[in-house]
Curated annotation (Swiss-Prot):
Primary localization: membrane
GO BP of this protein: intracellular protein transmembrane transport; protein import; protein targeting; protein transport by the Sec complex
Its EC number(s): 7.4.2.8
Name the record gives this protein: Protein translocase subunit SecA 2
Gene (UniProt): secA2
Natural source organism: Clostridioides difficile (strain 630) (Peptoclostridium difficile)
Family: Belongs to the SecA family.
Length: 781
């Protein structure tokens, strides 16, 4: 233990010492638990719940609850939690992130904290990266939970809403981040409370927490409806962009920006038969041209997206997975569809949106697990208030992480990778090769095929075969090429379960991991390395890098340029240099910082709309929960009358005509506003008299239609009006974000401008909701 402790942060070391005291208590209960029957172990659940009712806390019953789970895990799964797994479980219960190396049995770690927190009856959500893992983990762990009297459910895509609702009612619910997030949005669009599927967001345990809370945090969840625009403009813009030359546009790959030059603008004006492309009336055309440029010059097929069944599918740059149901926004997806000659689907209109940051912050308690979180600890703390605790490994890591081999050109690098694969393959040692894109994995695959080397390819195009391919990657002679191993969730066991073969693979040195390029994030590189050397197994990792790789080319700076000039140009000569290694790491840190800024910016924008979202969703929930909204309706009426009085009656000359005309046109029935001696009354007296008349008019309506019918009408009208205006508002806020981004608000803080303009728009939204609701209710018969 002391050897491992020495490599942990001092703070973590202190934390682990404290946690070991709790684990000692759990260990002390092990013998007494062995003597209990299945029925007696199950009865402990009712005993724990009763103790909680009487005022004990989850922390009070933790040692016993963990000891119960450990015993049931042994009996049902044939697996006993190690001390380090119990430590990880306590960290998770405490609402922190447990950083545990690959192969340390993270799935078994979560069982005890899941059970403990499910005792509250408020539900626990176990969140993972795809449906396969959600269903697998649910099936794997259900025997433990069910034998303790807990119900277990799973949320998967395209599930019937009634089944979905039942799954959420379970004590423990497995599912993916996007399914939980989209259900939250959909629940806040339902016309009736019975259509909601989720209950309160109590406790979430996020597996591969860095992948979900960091990598995916740049892409907000969006529910969209079809827009009503002309799709021909995408085809025209696409035809034009095919004619442009390099001098017609300026491209910055580092910042991913592109714009027409003066010659490009002139060419566009000639192509479209207009005199001034930058005139305000041509803003829509300019936008379409710009998106077509981005689609052609910045977005690459088999890198950023793939074509599957005639559709453009986005590839997650961090995991290499196809992102089902996601579309690029602001017309970029349609521009790519035009470029690839597939069906162009209508520009979607945003109806509901939330970032992962703001969704996960809705949980009463949040925690997670991953093999790599320390590099992003600052982000976890500042955005999610989550501390990261490094959990020691059960056995020391003995994997050899070799120095990078660096080449001048990409071609030299790939030739060397193929040579290394051939050399290692002759020994029969299994090899895992990590690539950064579908395109690169297929390039390497072709090179190996030319040499007659049998291998497997795992990328966004083979998503359905993922688990099967990975499960065999540790066998003798196996060569597996994988796009970004991040979040794969399946352990690579040496020998794939065959004990004799496992020993043979160990004797050969375990799994050999080759990285063909440094990723933008050091964390993703560490995840690839961590596929090897699990549970004290031997293993080796090495990265092959070229000075033409994106991270080095875009972010390497002057150090790399100098190194390029100094090194010899001999073919296939690897450059080995401490300065170069440091430069690569500096480049990666630079990109990580930049990506953090992007995610912070996404959150800054969403924080503005998040406050508005809370107000609107609370309003909807009041209606759905059958709360009396009579007072709210009357307040709306009062506000409309007050605003009218302040607009038309305050000043040197009172505009009685304007005042009454406005109220008649807004909601009051004709000839009802008869106020004797109006010119002798104060402004407030006129407003109060008007309000009293409006109340009498509404009371008369209730008598005619019946109180119950009017109450039902109020709810129906308010829901419809809120939804209609909120959807328009969200879409307008999305457009405002794009507009502010384009204008860049010279000398102004774009986030401040967005917040200020967003506030004004929200005030206008509330005014529109008030007037439309009151108008419908007063004028409906």
């Amino acid at each position: 233990m002391s050897v491992i402790d020495s490599i942990l942060d001092k703070a973590d070391e202190q934390e682990i010492k404290k946690l070991n005291v709790i684990v000692d208590k759990i260990d002390a209960l092990e013998d007494s638990m062995k003597n209990l029957s299945y029925e007696e172990l199950k009865d402990m659940t009712a005993i724990f719940k009763n103790r909680l009712k009487k005022g004990e806390t989850l922390d009070d019953i933790l040692p016993e609850a963990f000891a119960v789970v450990r015993e049931v895990s042994k009996r049902k799964l044939g697996m006993r939690q190690y001390r380090v797994q119990l430590i990880g479980g306590i960290v998770i219960h405490q609402g922190k992130i447990a950083e545990m190396k690959t192969g340390e049995g993270k799935t078994l770690v979560e069982v005890a904290p899941v059970y403990l927190n499910a005792l509250t009856g408020k539900g626990v959500h176990v969140i993972t990266v795809n449906d396969y893992l959600a269903e697998r983990d649910k099936e794997l762990m259900s025997p433990v939970y069910e034998s303790l009297g807990m119900t277990v459910g799973v949320i998967i895509s395209n599930q019937d809403p009634n089944i979905r609702k039942q799954q959420y009612k379970c004590d423990i619910t497995y599912g993916t981040n996007s399914e939980f997030g989209f259900d939250y949005l959909r629940d806040n669009m339902v016309p009736d409370l019975s259509h909601k599927v989720q209950r309160e967001l109590n406790f979430a345990i996020v597996d591969e927490v860095d992948s979900i809370l960091i990598d995916e945090a740049r892409t907000p969840l969006i529910i969209a409806g079809d827009g009503d625009e002309d799709l021909k403009l995408y085809e025209l813009a696409n035809s034009f962009v095919k004619t442009v030359k390099e001098e017609d546009f300026e491209l910055d790959r580092k910042d991913k920006t592109i714009a027409l030059t003066a010659s490009g603008i002139s060419k566009a004006e000639s192509f479209f038969g207009i005199t001034n492309l930058t005139d305000i009336k041509n803003i829509e055309l300019y936008h379409h041209i710009n998106q077509a440029l981005r689609g052609h010059k910045l977005m690459e097929k088999d890198v950023d997206y793939v074509i599957s069944n005639g559709e453009v599918m986005i590839v997650d740059e961090f995991t290499g997975r196809v992102m089902d149901g996601r579309r690029y926004t602001d017309g970029l997806h349609q521009a790519i569809e035009a470029k690839e000659g597939v069906e162009i689907k209508n520009e979607s209109k945003t109806m509901a949106t939330v970032t992962y940051q703001n969704f996960f912050r809705l949980y009463e308690k949040l925690s997670g697990m991953t093999g790599t979180a320390k590099t992003e600890e600052g982000e976890f703390e500042s955005i999610y208030k989550l501390n990261v605790v490094q959990i020691p490994t059960n056995r020391p890591v003995i994997r050899a992480d070799l120095h990078d081999k660096v080449f001048k050109t990409e071609e030299e690098k790939y030739s060397a990778v193929v040579e290394e694969i051939i050399r290692i393959h002759k020994t029969r040692q299994p090899i895992l090769v990590g690539t950064v894109s579908v395109e690169k994995s297929e390039k390497l695959s072709k090179m190996l095929k030319k040499q007659g080397i049998k291998h497997q390819v795992l990328n966004a195009k083979q998503h359905d075969k993922e688990a099967e391919i990975i499960s065999k990657a540790g066998k003798l002679d196996a060569i597996t090429i994988a796009t970004n191993m991040a979040g794969r969730g399946t352990d690579i066991s040496l020998g794939a379960g065959d004990k004799e073969e496992e020993q043979e693979v160990k004797d050969l040195g375990g799994l050999y991991v080759i990285g063909t390029e440094r990723h933008e994030s050091r964390r993703i590189d560490n995840q690839l390395r961590g596929r090897s050397g699990r549970q004290g197994d031997p293993g080796t990792s090495r990265f092959f890098v070229s000075l033409e790789d994106d991270v080095i080319k875009l972010y390497g700076g002057k150090t790399i340029e100098k190194l390029m000039k100094r090194t010899s140009s001999n073919e296939n000569t690897a450059i080995e240099s401490k300065a170069l290694t440091r430069a690569i790491e500096r480049a990666q840190k630079g990109v990580e910082g930049k990506n953090f800024e992007i995610r912070k910016n996404v959150l800054k924008y969403d924080d503005t709309i998040n406050e508005q979202r809370k107000v609107i969703y609370n309003e909807r929930n009041k209606v759905l929960n059958d709360e009396d909204i009579q007072e709210d309706i009357q307040k709306m009426v009062k506000d409309i009358i007050q605003e009218a009085g302040e607009t038309y009656l305050i000043g040197r000359k009172r505009d009685y005509y304007g005042y009454f005309k406005h109220l008649y046109s807004t909601f009051m029935p004709a000839d009802t506003l008869l106020i004797p001696g109006v010119d002798k009354k104060s402004v407030q007296e006129i407003i109060d008299s008007t309000y009293e008349i409006s109340k009498r008019v509404y009371d008369l309506k209730k008598m005619m239609l019946g109180i119950d019918k009017v109450a039902e009408l109020e709810k129906t009208v308010l829901l419809k009006v809120v939804d209609q205006y909120w959807i328009d508002h969200i879409d307008a806020m999305e457009q405002l974000k794009q507009y502010i981004g384009l204008k860049s608000y010279a000398q102004k803080d774009p986030f401040k401008e967005y917040a200020l303009e967003g506030y004004d728009m929200f005030e206008a939204l509330n005014k529109n909701i008030r007037e439309a609701t009151v108008q419908y209710l007063y004028k409906f018969n």
